[in-house]
UniProtKB/Swiss-Prot annotation:
Single GO term (MF): structural molecule activity
A Pfam family hit: Flagellin_N
Signal sequence, start to end: none
Name of the gene this protein is made from: flaC
Keyword field: Secreted
PANTHER family, per database record: FLAGELLIN
Protein name per Swiss-Prot or TrEMBL: Secreted flagellin C
One Gene Ontology cellular component annotation held by this UniProt entry: bacterial-type flagellum
Compartment(s) where it occurs, according to its Swiss-Prot or TrEMBL record: Secreted
Biological function: Might play a role in virulence.
Length: 249
């Protein structure tokens, strides 16, 4: 019984292809080695970008805390402004010639209590246990944000002196205006920082998922496939040799 020449040629064809595939796999491995150096550089850059975005994100968190401080301060000043309005009303009443001394004494008593409540509002306005009416520095995405809020003096307030009350109200208005400007500035900083963080994360992802990394994965997958093909071809060759040996016996 004779072995078909066509079968032999087919087996040799598979074996040759398997050999070529193995050679190609070796070339691919060499290519991976060449690429790995670039990937290491990319990875270092990606790590730097990740660190940068993490720093920016923490700065954004700090900036939100700064806004929280300003919002607490503004809420307190809203209450204080209402108290100042009441003091102004009492001051106008004091100028009523029809009031007797007892009635004026009652107005002064109320005014004293209002002044005490104003002081309490300044002293009890806290964020995370810290009084907001002081100087605070917050490291944010693009630098440092400083909240410089000092409590207003109330010792000179008197319903017998309306000018002292109107001056106090003017100072309140200026302080609230500064708070509003501060919130707007920090919000703008947050928006810019968030965009920078997004850009850093996008750049990091591009480096970690670039074509070169994809090629490395492709090389590994092809190498496995080609070795599998070589194994199948070798197995076929071994089976063929076994059949030949049996026929020659």
């Amino acid at each position: 019984m004779m072995i078909s020449d066509a079968t032999m040629m087919q087996q040799n064809y598979y074996l040759n292809n398997a050999q070529k595939a193995s050679d190609k796999a070796l070339e691919n491995i060499a290519a991976v080695r060449a690429i790995s150096g670039v990937d290491s550089a990319n990875l270092a850059i990606a790590d730097s970008l990740r660190s940068q975005s993490s720093t920016i994100d923490q700065g954004v968190a700090n900036a939100y805390d700064a806004i929280g401080v300003l919002q607490i301060a503004d809420a307190s000043l809203t209450n204080i402004s209402q108290s100042a309005d009441r003091l102004n009303e009492l001051s106008v009443k004091m100028n009523n010639a029809a009031l007797n001394d007892s009635q004026k004494g009652m107005l002064r008593t109320e005014a004293t209590r209002i002044q005490e409540s104003i002081n309490d509002s300044f002293n009890n306005a806290t964020y995370n246990g810290k009084n907001v009416f002081q100087t605070m520095n917050f490291v944010v995405g693009s630098g440092t944000e400083t909240t410089n809020l000092n409590p207003l003096a109330t010792g000179g307030l008197s319903i017998d002196n309306q000018d002292s009350i109107t001056n106090f109200m003017d100072q309140l208005g200026s302080l609230r205006s500064e708070i509003g400007s501060g919130i707007n500035a920090i919000t703008s900083n947050i928006n810019a920082s968030v965009q920078n963080s997004i850009n850093s994360k996008a750049a990091e992802n591009n480096l970690l998922n670039n074509d070169m990394a994809k090629n490395v994965n492709d090389f590994n997958a092809n190498y496995l496939k080609e070795n599998a093909a070589a194994f199948v071809a070798a197995q076929s060759n071994m089976q063929l040799q076994s059949k030949i040996a049996n026929l020659l016996q």
